[in-house]
Amino acid sequence: MCFGLPNINREGYSFIVVSFIVTCIAFSISWGFGVTCLFPTLLCTYFFRDPARAVPNNKNLILSPADGVISKIEEVNYPLSAENGEEKKFTLVSIFLSVLNVHVNRIPISGTIKEMSYKKGKFVSAMSNRSSNENEKQVIVIEYEKGKEIIVEQIAGLIARRIVCNLGISQNVKAGERFGIIRFGSRVNIYVPADTEVRVSEGQTVIGGETIIANLNKENVQEKLTFDVI
């Protein structure tokens, strides 16, 4: 935060600048018109806010990649590689983001980006669980140990038709780091190994980079945590 203003994600700069200019022009025409145009400017500023987070510093913890509400948890088979058709069992944790949530996405666990793919699809409302299978999405595979991966999906919604992912193959990433954003309401799925201890439940509100989704080592549940502010 600087000068009392909230941190703003750079993806929102153009929206906010245009809205601000329109608002200034509107005020020059009439006070009432200016006040009316001020509302979307404030709304854009609020939507693209990017607050710092206290990230738990523990390599065994899988953190929430997004703010929102857990809409579904289920065990699934996921095709890990398009080349050989390999499938593995994962636990899917699906997070719905409303337009009021912070939409900046964060890395759930430290590791290396092993695979990335962008899949075209529909723009079903993100409130529907159908969006996980039918909608346009960015798929990210993170290898946290040799041969062990988790998968993150950024999913577009009815309004959110712009997925931003600032990652590359073989890039080293750290838990809690910002890696992208989905504009105006969306869904983020995270697939964790099926034998992992899931620490959240359906209907629970989660915070990106802070809420613990799962623990890779059940013996470390009571371990004292330290935090990095990112």
From Swiss-Prot:
Q: Which residues form the active site?
A: S186
Q: How is it modified after translation?
A: Is synthesized initially as an inactive proenzyme. Formation of the active enzyme involves a self-maturation process in which the active site pyruvoyl group is generated from an internal serine residue via an autocatalytic post-translational modification. Two non-identical subunits are generated from the proenzyme in this reaction, and the pyruvate is formed at the N-terminus of the alpha chain, which is derived from the carboxyl end of the proenzyme.
**A Pfam family of this chain:** PS_Dcarbxylase
Provide the coiled-coil residue spans.
none
Tell me which Gene Ontology terms the entry assigns under biological process: phosphatidylethanolamine biosynthetic process
Residues of the site described as Cleavage (non-hydrolytic): G185, S186
What is known about what this protein does?
A: Catalyzes the formation of phosphatidylethanolamine (PtdEtn) from phosphatidylserine (PtdSer).
EC number from the UniProt entry? 4.1.1.65
Q: Which reaction does it catalyse?
A: a 1,2-diacyl-sn-glycero-3-phospho-L-serine + H(+) = a 1,2-diacyl-sn-glycero-3-phosphoethanolamine + CO2
Sequence similarity: Belongs to the phosphatidylserine decarboxylase family. PSD-A subfamily.
Pathway noted in the entry: Phospholipid metabolism; phosphatidylethanolamine biosynthesis; phosphatidylethanolamine from CDP-diacylglycerol: step 2/2
Q: Give the superkingdom in one word.
A: Bacteria
- One cellular component term from this protein's GO annotations in UniProt: plasma membrane
A GO molecular function for this record?
Answer: phosphatidylserine decarboxylase activity
- Descriptive protein name: Phosphatidylserine decarboxylase proenzyme
Cofactor binding comment, as recorded: Binds 1 pyruvoyl group covalently per subunit.
Needed cofactors, names only, are: pyruvate
Entry membrane topology: Peripheral membrane protein
**Pyruvic acid (Ser) modified-residue sites:** S186
Q: What is its main location?
A: membrane
